[in-house]
Amino acid sequence: MESQIQIKLFATLQPFAPELGEAYPISPGISIRSLLEQLNIPQEKAKLIFIDGIKANLTSTLNGGERVGIFPPVGGG
């Protein structure tokens, strides 16, 4: 059974955004690591990951209905 999440990619990750917009279909139980692979986002480019506003990691799982935000490393000077 397929579910959906709301996904928001920030800054330099925006080119990896799904063509369908923020709503993205997933299989329940998918890990963040697998989601990154589906979106072709290298793991080292996903520095901060939030699920429903709570910091997550690569082994966190999604079941559908969540809001996921992914941020790249921040550089400055």
Predicted regions and their residues:
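Ubiquitin-like/PB1-type beta-grasp interaction modules and other compact soluble beta-rich domains
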Residues: 1-76
